[in-house]
Every structure is written in C-alpha cells, then in structure tokens.
C-alpha cells in the first residue's frame, strides 16, 4: 500500500473523531448496499515465478484498471458502528512477464478473483446527515490462476486458491433521503500470494519446472448507496 494512500485516511479519521459529538448517531437497523468500484489491481513479485533458469527476468504488464461491483448486507447499531457481509463480483485479468533470452515469448498469467468479506465501519457524524467513516475488513478471496507462454497452445496448469484477505479504508457519506445514504470512499485490499500449476508443455530444457506467481493487491475507489430498514 503506497504511503500517500495511507496518509489520505488520517485527515478523515481525525476530523471525524474531533466532531464525534457534533450530531446524533443514526438509528439502528438492518441495511442493504450496492457499490460501484473503480479498481487498480497490481501483480507484485512476479519475478518469484519458477523459471527455466535461462536469461534474466523481464517485467511486463503488472497493473490492470477495471470497473467492478459488490453487494452488501449488514446491521447499523445506532452508536456509530456497523458490520456487514460483502460479496465482490468475479473479475478476470491478465498479467505478463518474460525472459531476456526469449524476448518475444512472454508468460501470460490469467486470474479470476472474487471475494467474500466481513467489514466493520465506524461512522463519525459531522451533522445529522453528513459523516466520515473508517473501515476494516477480513475475508476470503477465491482466485483461479492459469496462463500460457508464447502462444495459447503452451499452457500452465490451472490452480484454484482460497486466500485470507484484508482491507483498510475511509470515506464520506450523506443521507440524501430518509433511510437512504450515498457514500464514496477508498480502500486498500491485499489478496495474498497466488500461483499457477506447472507448465504442461516441455520447455527449452526439456522439463516441466516452471510456474507463474504473484501477490495481488487492489487500490479501490468506490461509490455506493445504502438503504436502512
């Protein structure tokens, strides 16, 4: 997580804490929410992939930007705290890397990722309608990993992993109508390490000793609406 992203969280939390007594907390009750999420995903540490030992690692496309979404349901306790379950929709991406010896034969790592999270929120009411919030979440990410090398007949075996995942974030919210709140925020998500199976093709050394590895993280910018029953 970049330092500037962390610093963005501090003013929001400090502002909310200093004004925590400025307005009443919202009522308690169950709620549902829907989110649109602008995601900037990065595949870190691709140089840790098992390679044939010929040439040096060459970085390729390690970042993807895409729009995703999620659904959530939770409970608002009436004291500034909320908890919810959230499902983040499946999304497919592709990342590349190569070898200095085989300049035109890039490895293509494909990922299909989806998440189920338990999130905790602390709302700091600045007025009766406007609030800032901090959030943290833990959960699992199901990630299918595969890929190919050079051309799509040279496959790496598919692998499915279920990883521990965590998130940290902050944002602002506004009650636009009674029981209906709009919000916008940022969160950092770490989905852990992923890897494909080994190459199903025979490589330059006549062996099946390669795979594709990375650590997946997201910087997510979201807007959403929440309706409280």
Enumerate the language-model features and the residues they cover.
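Outer-membrane beta-barrel translocator domains and adjoining extracellular loop/strand segments
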Residues: 44-52, 94-103, 144-154, 195-202
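Cleavable N-terminal export/targeting peptides
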Residues: 1-28
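Predominantly the C-terminal beta-signal and adjacent terminal strand-loop region
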Residues: 92, 96, 176-229
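Gram-negative (and chloroplast) outer-membrane scaffold detector with strong preference
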Residues: 23-27, 36-40, 72-148, 216-229
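Short sequence motifs at beta-strands and strand-loop junctions characteristic
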Residues: 26, 61-67, 110-115, 158-165, ...
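Transmembrane beta-barrel strand/turn architecture of Gram-negative outer membrane proteins
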Residues: 163-174
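Surface-exposed strand-loop-strand hairpins of Gram-negative outer-membrane beta-barrel proteins
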Residues: 38-69, 157-162
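Extracellular loop and loop/strand-boundary signature of outer-membrane beta-barrel proteins
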Residues: 54-60, 101-109, 151-158, 207-213
């Amino acid at each position: 997580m970049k330092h500037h992203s962390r610093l963005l969280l501090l003013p929001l939390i400090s502002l909310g804490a200093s004004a925590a007594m400025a307005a009443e907390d919202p009522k308690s009750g169950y709620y549902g929410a829907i989110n649109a999420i602008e995601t900037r995903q990065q595949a870190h540490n691709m140089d840790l992939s098992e390679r044939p030992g010929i040439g040096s690692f060459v970085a390729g496309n390690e970042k993807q930007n895409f729009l995703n979404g999620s659904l959530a349901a939770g409970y608002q306790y009436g004291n500034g705290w909320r908890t919810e379950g959230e499902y983040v929709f499946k999304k497919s991406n592709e990342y590349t890397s190569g070898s200095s010896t085989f300049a035109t034969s890039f490895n293509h790592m494909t990922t299909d990722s989806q998440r189920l999270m338990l999130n905790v929120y602390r709302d700091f009411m600045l007025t009766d309608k406007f609030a800032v919030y901090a959030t943290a979440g833990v959960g699992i990410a199901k990630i299918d990993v595969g890929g190919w090398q050079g051309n799509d007949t040279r496959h790496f075996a598919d692998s499915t992993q279920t990883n521990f995942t965590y998130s940290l974030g902050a944002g602002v919210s506004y009650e636009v109508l009674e029981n209906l709140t709009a919000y916008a925020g940022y969160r950092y998500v770490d989905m852990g390490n992923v890897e494909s199976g080994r190459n199903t093709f025979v490589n330059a050394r006549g062996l099946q000793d390669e795979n594709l590895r990375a650590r997946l993280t997201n910087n997510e910018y979201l807007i959403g609406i929440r309706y409280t029953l």
